[in-house]
């Protein structure tokens, strides 16, 4: 069954090593076989994923991922992986997550034309600082030379480009706006289940009582800070709030984002 699949135990056995190497990672991104994990790891099996430039400093490779890689093949393999993971216990709908889908959103929608896309929006100063913090920590697992300021500059520019690309895709004539839902990160933190209810309602999806109860239990069992607090500041990574907000100005205005306290 879904609950006793032997792959669960095999997967869980891989995580203690991460906890030993970078114990602070759990506070940023808890991992477990029964927890959600980002598609960026499955995309890595195609060798087309920002995961590698997160873990290692390989800018020329990431340039190729950004501008030349074949995302049609990425999502063909992505579908095979979902079929492999779910063939014993088929469900009505997958819930998938990763910012890396910005890179190939057009091909994701071609592969899964009935997909419903939730965009999470946040003050880019906070987003870029958090991303730089996570990347700096992950790179420290394999290198003694980690430049957090370079990481922030590099990824801020790349993510801005991919964000603009994904907005161009969704603004095209091929995809109805009802296929997309806008969510502010701060709203989700304040009322996780309330936002989930809005998502289900917006997409016309049934939310069963059993599913709602399980979500509420999970939220109660996993409060913010359960595994420690992830602390970071723009100054540590050379993130200039004024410059970043000016650069992302059209994005912030379009989606009604206000500057967060730093």
Report the location of each language-model feature.
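PAPS-dependent sulfation machinery
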Residues: 1-94
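PAPS-dependent sulfotransferases, especially Golgi type II membrane carbohydrate sulfotransferases
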Residues: 63-75, 86, 131-182, 186-262
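Active-site-proximal structural scaffolding
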Residues: 71, 98-101, 110-113, 120, ...
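Well-ordered alpha-helical segments embedded in enzymatic catalytic cores
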Residues: 77-81, 104, 165
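Flexible, glycine/threonine-enriched loop-and-boundary segments that flank and lead into catalytic domains
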Residues: 87-114, 172
């Amino acid at each position: 069954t879904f609950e006793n699949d032997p792959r669960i135990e095999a997967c869980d056995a891989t995580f203690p090593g991460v906890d030993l190497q970078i114990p602070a990672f759990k506070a940023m991104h808890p991992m477990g076989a029964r927890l959600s994990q980002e598609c960026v790891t499955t995309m890595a099996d195609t060798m087309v994923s920002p995961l590698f430039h997160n873990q290692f400093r390989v800018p020329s490779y990431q340039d190729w991922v950004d501008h030349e890689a074949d995302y049609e093949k990425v999502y063909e393999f992505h579908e095979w992986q979902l079929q492999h993971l779910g063939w014993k216990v088929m469900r009505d709908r997958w819930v998938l997550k990763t910012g890396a889908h910005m890179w190939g959103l057009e091909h994701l929608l071609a592969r899964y034309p009935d997909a419903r896309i939730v965009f999470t929006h946040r003050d880019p100063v906070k987003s870029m600082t958090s991303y730089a913090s996570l990347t700096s920590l992950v790179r420290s697992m394999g290198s003694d030379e980690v430049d957090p300021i370079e990481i922030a500059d590099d990824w801020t520019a790349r993510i801005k480009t991919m964000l603009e690309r994904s907005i161009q895709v969704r603004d095209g004539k091929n995809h109805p706006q009802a296929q997309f839902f806008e969510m502010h990160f701060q709203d989700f933190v304040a009322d996780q289940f309330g936002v989930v209810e809005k998502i289900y309602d917006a997409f016309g999806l049934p939310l069963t009582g059993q599913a709602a109860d399980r979500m509420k239990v999970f939220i109660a069992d996993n409060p913010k800070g359960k595994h420690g607090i992830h602390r970071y500041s723009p100054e540590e990574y050379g993130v200039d709030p004024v410059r970043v907000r000016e650069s992302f100005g059209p994005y912030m205005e379009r989606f009604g984002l206000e500057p967060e306290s730093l």
